[in-house]
């Protein structure tokens, strides 16, 4: 098959959509398909890797928003250019609903009688009331565009429940994937801790430093926990506040803020951790970072919001707590730090779940099958 993966939200935009598209492209290429990534005209930092893998990258010029770092509009000329590129493909697969390029590609694909799909990665609109108000008048337009795909893929049941408000297009749930060969439990924890200058148990947080991810809640909970180090990986608007918060709580010596970390380094950081924590305040459709922790054999403490309970089975691969509840978060972390057998059991279960359901090989098989099903009705 000749497959175009289309989205404004590709690199250098950091996040789950970009990661998903990139790994999907690589795996589809491995399976013998011709693949191209169609995105905006910013430098992605992935050009060399894609060239080496013989994956084309097609850039469509548009107006880039300085706030969300993606294209927010396209000229008539750019739209015609997009349509011209897409003619060469059998499958048009857009990513991230409610973004201009994805919706334009869905319309173009349907009008050209191509197998047209859209993956929805988010439910965050449902938790931004001001955004609801601002976009209220344009939701009918979005609903119209969401009728163009032959099928919508949702990364979780939570994402499906959200997108169902706007379309009656058939929806299939196919989760995100993780590279289970890159993220593994086969590290020497003590050796890695020594390399990073850390002793004792390690609690790990990897995500954006923003309010909705709950890092401030984690700091408050961790301040009551003794004999452990908290590693916080990620950048974001809350980072200066969090550093001041750690100092105020008197735990700055036990909290290491590592900022943004290159993806090649992340497996080693997961490899030295004992417990992974993601205390999200608001709902997320799907957290790839939880899969990375599970693939690394780590027990996970997370909040029971959005699609997270679909990944973490309570007391089987991790522990779930209510969002914003510092006491229950602290108790869950302490429970794991104090019980070596429980940590190992939960970590092993998480790794097994990844191998059975969430490895990229498993996920791409499902997506490929969906392509074939849509092509069969053309």
Question: Where are the regions that the model predicts?
Answer:
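A conserved mid-protein helix/loop that constitutes part of the nucleotide-sugar donor-binding site
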Residues: 19, 23, 201-224, 237-243, ...
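Carbohydrate-associated surface elements
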Residues: 41, 158, 177
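Short alpha-helical donor nucleotide-sugar binding micro-motif in glycosyltransferases
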Residues: 86, 260-261, 268-273
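Nucleotide-sugar donor phosphate/pyrophosphate-binding loop at the beta->alpha transition
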Residues: 115, 125-144, 161
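Acidic donor-binding loop of glycosyltransferase active sites
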Residues: 150, 254, 271-285, 298
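Short hydrophobic beta-strand element within catalytic cores of glycosyltransferases
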Residues: 299-302, 312
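Conserved acidic donor-binding segment of nucleotide-sugar-dependent glycosyltransferases
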Residues: 314-315, 319-326, 335-341
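A short, well-ordered alpha-helix in the C-terminal region of glycosyltransferases
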Residues: 328, 335, 342-357, 366-369
């Amino acid at each position: 098959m000749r497959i175009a993966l289309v989205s404004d939200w590709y690199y250098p935009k950091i996040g789950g959509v970009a990661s998903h598209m990139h790994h999907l492209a690589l795996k589809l290429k491995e399976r013998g398909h011709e693949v191209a990534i169609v995105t905006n005209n910013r430098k992605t930092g992935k050009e060399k890797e894609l060239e080496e893998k013989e994956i084309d990258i097609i850039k469509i010029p548009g107006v880039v928003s300085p706030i969300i770092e993606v294209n927010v509009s396209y000229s008539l000329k750019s739209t015609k250019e997009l349509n011209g590129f897409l003619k060469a493909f059998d499958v048009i697969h857009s990513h991230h609903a409610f973004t201009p390029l994805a919706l334009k590609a869905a319309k173009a694909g349907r009008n050209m009688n191509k197998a047209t799909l859209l993956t929805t990665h988010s439910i965050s609109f449902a938790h931004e009331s001001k955004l609801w108000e601002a976009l209220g008048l344009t939701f009918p337009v979005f609903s119209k565009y969401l009728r163009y795909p032959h099928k919508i893929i949702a990364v979780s049941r939570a994402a499906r429940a959200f997108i169902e408000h706007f379309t009656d297009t058939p929806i299939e749930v196919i989760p995100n994937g993780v590279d289970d060969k890159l993220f593994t439990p086969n590290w020497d924890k003590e050796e890695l801790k020594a390399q990073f200058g850390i002793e004792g148990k390690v609690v790990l947080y990897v995500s954006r430093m923003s309010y909705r991810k709950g890092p401030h809640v984690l700091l408050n909970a961790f301040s009551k926990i003794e004999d452990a180090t908290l590693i916080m990986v990620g950048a974001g608007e809350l980072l200066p506040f969090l550093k001041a918060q750690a100092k105020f709580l008197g735990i700055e010596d036990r909290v290491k803020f590592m900022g943004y970390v290159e993806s090649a380094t992340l497996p080693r950081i997961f490899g030295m951790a004992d417990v992974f924590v993601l205390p999200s305040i608001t709902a997320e459709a799907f957290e790839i970072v939880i899969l990375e922790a599970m693939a690394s054999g780590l027990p996970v403490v997370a909040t029971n919001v959005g699609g997270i309970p679909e990944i973490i089975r309570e007391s089987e691969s991790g522990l779930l707590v209510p969002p914003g509840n510092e006491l229950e978060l602290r108790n869950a972390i302490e429970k794991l730090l104090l019980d070596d057998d429980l940590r190992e059991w939960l970590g092993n279960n998480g790794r097994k779940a990844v191998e059975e359901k969430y490895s990229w090989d498993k996920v791409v098989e499902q997506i490929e099958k969906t392509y074939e099903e849509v092509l069969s009705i053309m």
